[in-house]
């Protein structure tokens, strides 16, 4: 398939610049298995979750990964941390008039120092330190001084509210530079109501990198090279899904990152069945993919020609997906990270 097959017209006014007043006040477009669509509100998801289903959430925590500083020569720099390597080192994008060389010293947020150790492709390996507080780790320095890394299509400066709202209520493991946005719609009350219905909640971890916003640049999507991200699927999550299957329940992935975790872990196992996994994945899910774990997907609305709309098409079917997106535009759903959600049921064989 061609990249252009996944293009659609999106009025700029539909790109959400702020979150809804309350997490659950978003709208929900349901793609039903019979091919129809239903316009709902997010709390209506309760009526689509059955007893014995399990919802799999990504518990990554967004770090305030955007940092501003200057070179010793006075030139301005902007860092977007891609990955925390250890207690001192990070991999980061650096924006400046001239790329800093190995050994270059930077002063960050007028608070601590950074030294460029080397380069790995488009990324820089950088060591962070604070002379007056040498015990502080790189992550602690980032947490104390960084800015929330809002996506490029949110055209405003980050605000105090974003530290809470660009984060899921169940976030636990720091490391993402972008939120797993399907989870932003849940508050603790809704999670309790889902459990009260007899559905279970499980967790995986995928630290979303800035590569999630990288556009597909090749025409033939089979030639696209997917970015790599760190994931973890724990034994207790594998066991939960096994029990769900035994009870006749469905696996509902909350977000494309949860899909990529589960399908990667199954793909990497010897027999193609879900197994615990910790490592990296560059799985690229496109139409024609045979899903091994996920039955239903909850996701936000994605960018035209993005790898994420391709993933949705793989589960929902290409024509159904593009029709649903056209419906969402017509009905003025809000798009992207702070926008509305869609619940995707794959089509039945006769729909």
Curated annotation (Swiss-Prot):
PANTHER family: S-ADENOSYLMETHIONINE:TRNA RIBOSYLTRANSFERASE-ISOMERASE. InterPro entries: QueA, QueA_dom1, QueA_dom2, QueA_sf. It comes from the Bacteria. Keywords: Cytoplasm, Queuosine biosynthesis, S-adenosyl-L-methionine, Transferase. One of its GO terms (molecular function) is S-adenosylmethionine:tRNA ribosyltransferase-isomerase activity. Belongs to the QueA family. It is found in: Cytoplasm. Its main location: cytoplasm. Monomer. It is an enzyme of class 2 (transferase). GO terms for biological process: queuosine biosynthetic process; tRNA wobble guanine modification. NCBIfam families: PRK00147.1, queA. This is S-adenosylmethionine:tRNA ribosyltransferase-isomerase. It catalyses: 7-aminomethyl-7-carbaguanosine(34) in tRNA + S-adenosyl-L-methionine = epoxyqueuosine(34) in tRNA + adenine + L-methionine + 2 H(+). Pathway: tRNA modification; tRNA-queuosine biosynthesis. Pfam families: Queuosine_synth. The gene is queA. Its EC number is 2.4.99.17. Coiled coil: none annotated. Transfers and isomerizes the ribose moiety from AdoMet to the 7-aminomethyl group of 7-deazaguanine (preQ1-tRNA) to give epoxyqueuosine (oQ-tRNA). One of its GO terms (cellular component) is cytoplasm. It comes from Hydrogenovibrio crunogenus (strain DSM 25203 / XCL-2).
């Amino acid at each position: 398939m061609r990249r252009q097959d996944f293009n659609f017209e999106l009025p700029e006014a539909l790109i959400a610049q702020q979150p809804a007043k309350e997490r659950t006040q978003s709208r929900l477009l349901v793609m039903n298995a019979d091919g129809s669509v239903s316009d709902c509100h997010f709390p209506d998801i309760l009526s689509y979750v059955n007893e014995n289903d399990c919802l799999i959430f990504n518990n990554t925590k967004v770090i305030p990964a955007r940092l501003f500083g200057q070179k010793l020569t006075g030139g301005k720099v902007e860092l977007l941390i891609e990955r925390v390597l250890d207690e001192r080192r990070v991999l980061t994008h650096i924006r400046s008039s001239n790329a800093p060389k190995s050994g270059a010293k930077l002063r960050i947020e007028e608070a601590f120092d950074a030294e460029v150790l080397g380069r790995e492709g488009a990324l820089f390996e950088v060591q962070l330190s604070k002379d007056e507080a040498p015990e502080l780790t790189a992550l602690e320095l980032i947490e104390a001084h960084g800015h929330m890394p809002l996506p490029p299509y949110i055209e405003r400066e980050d605000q105090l509210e974003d530290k809470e709202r660009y984060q899921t209520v169940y976030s636990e493991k720091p490391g993402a530079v972008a939120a797993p946005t399907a989870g932003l719609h849940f508050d603790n009350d809704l999670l309790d109501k889902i459990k009260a219905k007899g559905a279970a909640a499980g967790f995986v971890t995928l630290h979303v990198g800035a590569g999630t916003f990288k556009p597909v640049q090749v025409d033939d999507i089979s030639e696209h090279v997917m970015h790599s991200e760190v994931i973890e699927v724990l034994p207790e999550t594998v066991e939960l899904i096994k029990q769900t299957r035994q009870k006749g329940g469905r696996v509902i992935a909350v977000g494309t990152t949860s899909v990529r975790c589960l399908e990667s872990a199954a793909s990497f196992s010897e027999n193609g069945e879900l197994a615990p996994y910790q490592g990296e994945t560059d799985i690229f899910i496109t139409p024609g993919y045979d899903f091994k774990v996920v039955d239903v997907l909850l996701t936000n609305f994605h960018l035209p020609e993005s790898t994420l709309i391709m993933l949705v098409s793989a589960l929902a079917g290409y024509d159904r997906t593009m029709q649903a997106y056209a419906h969402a535009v017509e009905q003025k759903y809000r798009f992207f990270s702070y926008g509305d959600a869609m619940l995707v049921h794959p089509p039945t064989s006769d729909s």
